[in-house]
Amino acid sequence: MKKGCTPTISIALDKPNDLGARLLAVRHETRWNGAGIIIQIPEDWRARDSALLWIALTGIDAPVAIVTLAEHADSIAIHAPEEPMTVALGRPDLVRRAQLWQTLLPDGVLSAGDRDELAARYEFSPRAISRTIRRAAVDRIGKAELHAAARAIGSANISTIAQPLPLVYTRDDLVLPPRMLGELDLAIAWIRYKRKIYDTWGFGRRIALGRGLTALFAGPPGTGKTMTAQVLARDLGLDLYRVDLSRVMSKYIGETEKNLSKLFDEAQASGAALLFDEADALFGKRSESRDAHDRYANLEIGYLLQRMEEHEGVAILATNRVGDLDEAFLRRFHFLLDFPMPDASYRLRLWNGMLPREVDRAPDLDLGPLAATYELSGGEIRNCVLAAAYMAAAEGTCVRIDHLERGLRRELGKTGRIVVAPRRRSVEEEV
C-alpha cells in the first residue's frame, strides 16, 4: 500500500438486513488499521430500507462512503442522523465520451468521425463504453458491430419499462400522401443532421432546449402511425420502444414522475426512440384544479412537458383523439402528422401491397371493387388479407376473391358493420 493511502473495505449490499452482520465482521479491522468503509447500494433499493441502513451504522467510527444511484440519494440522506456530504457524479459529456472511445478502442478500428458519432448517439458511462467494446470484440470489431453492441448494452435497462418493436418495415411499405412523406424526410433529417445544426452551424448557442425530435402522430386506428414510427427509427438506425403507459402511471404521488424520469434517462443514454402509443391516456387535456387529484395530474403532465423539452432523442406520441390535447401541449411538438383514413386510390394500393409477390393469386382476382366499396383502414385491410391467405392455405388453393370477401366479413363484423355488394366500377371512377 502506498504511503499516505487509507485502506478501504468494500461491502456490496444485497439486503439491508445483512448490513449489521457484515459491519460486525469488519468492525475490528476498521479499528485496527483505520480502514474506511464503502457501501454499495443495489439498484432495487427501497426508500424504507434507508432507515435500517443508518441504524446499522450506529457506533461505527470509521469513515463511510455510500455509493448509490441518484434516485436513491434523497431517501438515504433524509434518514441520516446528520447532513451527509453528497457528491453527484454525472455521465461524461460529449467531449469526454469521444476521448474514452478513442482511448479504449484499438488503433485504426474507426475513423474520428465514426468515434464522434458513437459518442453523440450513446450517452454512456465509461463502464458501458468498455462493455460495448468487449461485446463487439467477440466477432470482427468494426462500426456495425460497435453500434449493435451499444444498442444491446443500452437497451438492457429500458426494456424493463418499455417494449422493443421489430423494425421490419421500409419506406416502400408506407402508403401515405406526399406531404406526409415529406414531413417524414424532414423528421429524419432533424436527427441525422443535429450535430451539424447545433455544433457546426452554431445554433447550439441560441437554442438550449428542444434539440431532440418530438412528433405527434394522430389519426384513427390502423392508419399507419406505428408503422411510420418503425420506418423512421429504422432509417435512423435507432431501436424503437413502445411505452406501456400502465407501467408508467401510478396512483402514488411522485411515482409517475420517477417512472418518466427513468424512462427518459435510459432512452437518452441508449439512443433509443420512444413511442407512446395510445398516448391520450396520459396526455389528455389538463384540467382546472378542482381538487388535490386534479392538481397532482396537472403536475404529472407538467413534468412530462419539461422532460420532453429537455430530451435530445426521439419521442413519438400516437393518439386516436388529437382533439383531447390542449394547445399548450401541441406547441411542444416539432412535427404534427395527421394520418387520414385512406381514400379509394390509397385503399387499392393497400390491398395490392398487403399481398406479397410470392402469394399465388387467382388469375381473375380484381381488388378494385373492394377498394372502391369499403372504407377500411390499412390495419383492417391487412387483417382481411391475412385471414384470406390462411383460408386459401387451408384449402390448398390460390387466393380468390371469395377468400377476401370472407375475410372482409370477419373484419367488418368486429365493429358491427355490414358487407354490401361491391361496386363494379373502377377506382379511377371513384376518385
Regions found by a protein language model. Name each.
Residues 8, 29-44, 61:
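Hydrophobic/aromatic interaction determinants used to assemble and anchor large protein complexes
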Residues 1-15, 23-25, 62-285, 290-431:
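AAA+ P-loop ATPase motor domain of ring mechanoenzymes
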Residues 21-24, 44-59, 300, 304:
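Conserved Walker B catalytic segment
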Residues 12-16, 37, 41-48, 71-73:
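Short acidic, S/G/P-rich loop/turn micro-motifs used as interaction or catalytic elements
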